């Protein structure tokens, strides 16, 4: 008889669970994290130490020392007459189960795979009169600092109830006959309750900075912090050496940014981003930082000046406005920019070489043309000789020699020589027939 009764009991449990799930509106997993945005305006004097507060206890990771006991389920009962609730049992994600009262051992049961499938329902094998009251299913996540609760009211009747389960507008109400089994449904299949990940690898904190006039989507990254201990620093060099976050930030949940000493150029909007992907935490805090000029300290009253006991140094001119400090930041060029400039230089050099070769070829061709024209003119002069030109030249010479040059000579000898020189040469007579006659005589 034990086996059929056990089969009948589990059939009843499955029937009640399928009926109750239709009325359980709280079985939908709640949001594990909320997006919180806080915005504040802060101001410090230049040279002071600025601290931008960014704290969150939900980002503390040291509670992972609990290993797999950071997720726990509690079932509590508050009687019909009110009064404080009493703890019935606990179930840890490692599988450890604890029942507080001896009378409930073996009578109250939970599924051993509750933290795997998200079914945290409580089974009461045989309902008694003292079991009536308000039951609460409490889920705690110590690591993510999450708390979720679900309430179910149990009514015990003498006979079979007319309505086994219904919804009263706030919670589920379950009516069960005395001695019958009861299943108090509590289902939450959120990944934060059913999955286990490496939490340290899913926590990261970012600090961003927006200079004045720069939109949020073009903000500069200052710091990256990881729960594993890795840190990355970005941003301009003049600011990188003056900002810091505590080394024990993830141990205390304090990610406040310290800037020391503060300069006028540090003005802008700073954002602290907290991300915990495992716990579903995404927070962003915004700080509008303004930097004021430091107040000038008054000179001591006893300082000498212009022979008097009071300071005679002229005070600052109120009409002159103090300018802001200008810091030139030289950003190193990338390798791609270097190759681009090198390409420009090589292209310019190649163009210059081509231009030089073109000029040389043109000059050489022009020089060859001149030589060819000179050779051609020389040949033409050697072939065509005009004897008339020579005759004219000889006549000119004779006319030149026949000119009467009036010279004053010291003696007659010189005068005669000069006349002989200017007189035309006597024509030479050549007897052509003489040679012919000699040949005939032979």
Curated annotation (Swiss-Prot):
Glycosylation sites: 119, 306
Modification sites for Phosphoserine: 228
Residue intervals on the Extracellular side: 20-341
Disulfide bonds: 54-137, 186-272
Domain Ig-like V-type: 29-157, 160-288
One term under GO cellular component: nucleus
Any one GO BP annotation for this protein: cell differentiation
RGD (motif): residue ranges: 252-254
Tissue: Detected in endothelial cells in mammary tissue, in both large vessels (left internal mammary artery) and small capillaries (vasa vasorum of the adventitia).
Site (Cleavage): 325-326
Induction of its expression: Up-regulated in vein endothelial cells (HUVECs) in response to VEGF signaling.
Pfam family membership, one: V-set
Disordered: annotated segments: 294-318
Domain of life: Eukaryota
Keyword Cell membrane: yes
Keywords: Cell adhesion, Cell junction, Cell membrane, Cell projection, Cytoplasm, Disulfide bond, Glycoprotein, Host-virus interaction, Immunoglobulin domain, Membrane, Nucleus, Phosphoprotein, Repeat, Signal, Tight junction, Transmembrane, Transmembrane helix
Cellular compartments annotated: Cell membrane; Cell junction, Tight junction; Cytoplasm; Cell projection, Cilium membrane
Cytoplasmic side: 363-442
Signal peptide: 1-19
Membrane-topology descriptor: Single-pass type I membrane protein
Recorded domain comment: The RGD motif is involved in integrin ITGAV:ITGB3 binding.
Primary role: Transmembrane protein which can modulate activity of various signaling pathways, probably via binding to integrin ITGAV:ITGB3. Mediates heterophilic cell-cell interactions in vitro. Inhibits osteoclastogenesis downstream of TNFSF11/RANKL and CSF1, where it may function by attenuating signaling via integrin ITGB3 and MAP kinase p38. Plays a role in cartilage formation where it promotes proliferation and maturation of growth plate chondrocytes. Stimulates formation of primary cilia in chondrocytes. (Microbial infection) Contributes to arthritogenic alphavirus pathogenesis and acts as a receptor for these viruses.
Subunit structure: Homodimer in cis. Does not appear to form trans-homodimers. Interacts with ITGB3; the interaction inhibits ITGAV:ITGB3 heterodimer formation.
PANTHER family: MATRIX REMODELING-ASSOCIATED PROTEIN 8
The protein's name: Matrix remodeling-associated protein 8
Species of the source: Homo sapiens (Human)
Lineage, uppermost ranks: Eukaryota, Metazoa, Chordata, Craniata, Vertebrata
């Amino acid at each position: 008889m034990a086996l059929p009764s056990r089969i009948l009991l589990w059939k009843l449990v499955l029937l009640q669970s399928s009926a109750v799930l239709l009325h359980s509106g709280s079985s939908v997993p709640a949001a594990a994290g909320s997006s919180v945005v806080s915005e504040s305006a802060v101001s410090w004097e230049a040279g002071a130490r600025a601290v931008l507060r960014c704290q969150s206890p939900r980002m503390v990771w040291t509670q992972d020392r609990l290993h797999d006991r950071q997720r726990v389920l509690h079932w509590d009962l508050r009687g019909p007459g009110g009064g404080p609730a009493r703890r019935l049992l606990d179930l840890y994600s490692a599988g450890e189960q604890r029942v507080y009262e001896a009378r409930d051992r073996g009578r109250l049961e939970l599924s051993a795979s509750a933290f795997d499938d998200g079914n945290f329902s409580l089974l009461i094998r045989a309902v008694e009169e003292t079991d009536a009251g308000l039951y609460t299913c409490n889920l705690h996540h110590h690591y993510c600092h999450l708390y979720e609760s679900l309430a179910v009211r149990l009514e015990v009747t003498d006979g079979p109830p007319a309505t086994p389960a219904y919804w009263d507008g706030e919670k589920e109400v379950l009516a069960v006959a005395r001695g019958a089994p009861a299943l108090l449904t509590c289902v939450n299949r959120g990944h934060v309750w059913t999955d286990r990940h490496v939490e340290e690898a899913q926590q990261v904190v970012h600090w961003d900075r927006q200079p004045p006039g720069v939109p949020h989507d073009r903000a500069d990254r200052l710091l990256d912090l990881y729960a594993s201990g890795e840190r990355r620093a970005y941003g301009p060099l003049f600011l990188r050496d003056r900002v810091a976050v505590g080394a024990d930030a993830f141990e205390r949940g304090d990610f406040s940014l310290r800037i020391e000493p503060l300069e006028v150029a540090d003005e802008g909007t700073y954002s602290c981003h907290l991300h915990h992907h495992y716990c579903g935490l995404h927070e962003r805090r915004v700080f509008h930082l303004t930097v004021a000029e430091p107040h000038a300290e008054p000179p001591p009253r006893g300082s000498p000046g212009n022979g008097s006991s009071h300071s005679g140094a002229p005070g600052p001119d109120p009409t002159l406005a103090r300018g802001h400090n200008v810091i030139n930041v030289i950003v190193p060029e990338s390798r791609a920019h270097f190759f681009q400039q090198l390409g420009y230089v090589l292209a310019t050099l190649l163009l210059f070489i081509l231009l030089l070769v073109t000029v040389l070829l043109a000059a050489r061709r022009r020089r060859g043309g001149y030589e060819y024209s000179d050779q051609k003119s020389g040949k033409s002069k050697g072939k065509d000789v005009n004897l008339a030109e020579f005759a004219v030249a000889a006549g000119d010479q004779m006319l030149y020699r026949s000119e009467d040059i009036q010279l004053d000579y010291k003696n007659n000898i010189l005068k005669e020589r000069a006349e002989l020189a200017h007189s035309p040469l006597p024509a030479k007579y050549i007897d052509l027939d003489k040679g012919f006659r000699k040949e005939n005589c032979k």
